[in-house]
Amino acid sequence: MSLNFLDFEQPIAELEAKIDSLTAVSRQDEKLDINIDEEVHRLREKSVELTRKIFADLGAWQVAQLARHPQRPYTLDYVRLAFDEFDELAGDRAYADDKAIVGGIARLEGRPVMIIGHQKGRETKEKIRRNFGMPAPEGYRKALRLMEMAERFNMPIITFIDTPGAYPGVGAEERGQSEAIARNLREMSRLNVPVICTVIGEGGSGGALAIGVGDKVNMLQYSTYSVISPEGCASILWKSANKAPLAAEAMGIIAPRLKELKLIDSIIPEPLGGAHRNPEAMAASLKAQLLEDLADLDVLSTDDLKNRRYQRLMSYGYA
């Protein structure tokens, strides 16, 4: 896979370009009387070392860029890599099927679970079809329908959060966007089955919270979770989106800060360079965390599960 490098990764990109050039030359003329392999090996080691150095000291704005990386794995990528027998379910049974939310039944190590997550899309047509991962009310109503189905069949619910936010269009507001989000928040707090939520990319405002009320809330290492985007915050406070890096630092949008505030439970480490560098390894780490969380929640009674979830929600906002 050809990698897209972000601005802060340009030194790495330059090294990788040299490696690609040398590799191409080696393929074109195998009779060259020079040892290219040794030079390629040296450059690869240098690239890994440089990547470690850069990623050891990322700021919040750089993490925000990684969370939005166009090659970052999405919900359906993790479904393919970490689950078996996925059967997608569609529609809210009232208005439409919102493609920005995907959901269905799958097996996690043989155990039936309900999966619900945002899906952004990669190519232009798919991005438009999925509305860039910004759900309308029917998307959240579909999610709630699947959660209620999971409760009826006593299946754990696993959600994957990756959205810039709920769709703010006029049509969405006319169809009750705020009501749909509020209803999900209420009903998720009452569910009688375990709910595990994981932020895999962007966790944008109420659009993220509408599938983010759970017994366990995890974040991938280079994901973000915030009430507004850094650009939106900067536009309000400084009247300029150019102040987004400053806003990102001030807002505390990254996983370590949110864990410090006890808003999330676990940070799932990503492969060196981010989840897009090795989706298979990332999926394996995510799967291990989900299995661990399920084991922790399985021992709780229904009453204990709901009481614990309630206490968790009521503790937000206290230092």
UniProtKB/Swiss-Prot annotation:
Acetyl-CoA carboxylase is a heterohexamer composed of biotin carboxyl carrier protein (AccB), biotin carboxylase (AccC) and two subunits each of ACCase subunit alpha (AccA) and ACCase subunit beta (AccD). Keywords: ATP-binding, Cytoplasm, Fatty acid biosynthesis, Fatty acid metabolism, Lipid biosynthesis, Lipid metabolism, Nucleotide-binding, Transferase. Disulfide bonds: none annotated. Its main location: cytoplasm. Its EC number is 2.1.3.15. It is found in: Cytoplasm. GO terms for molecular function: acetyl-CoA carboxylase activity; ATP binding; carboxyl- or carbamoyltransferase activity. Pathway: Lipid metabolism; malonyl-CoA biosynthesis; malonyl-CoA from acetyl-CoA: step 1/1. It holds the Pfam family ACCA. Gene3D superfamilies: 2-enoyl-CoA Hydratase, Chain A, domain 1. It comes from the Bacteria. The gene is accA. This is Acetyl-coenzyme A carboxylase carboxyl transferase subunit alpha. GO terms for cellular component: acetyl-CoA carboxylase complex. Component of the acetyl coenzyme A carboxylase (ACC) complex. First, biotin carboxylase catalyzes the carboxylation of biotin on its carrier protein (BCCP) and then the CO(2) group is transferred by the carboxyltransferase to acetyl-CoA to form malonyl-CoA. It catalyses: N(6)-carboxybiotinyl-L-lysyl-[protein] + acetyl-CoA = N(6)-biotinyl-L-lysyl-[protein] + malonyl-CoA. GO terms for biological process: fatty acid biosynthetic process; malonyl-CoA biosynthetic process. Coiled coil: none annotated. It is an enzyme of class 2 (transferase). It comes from Salmonella dublin (strain CT_02021853).
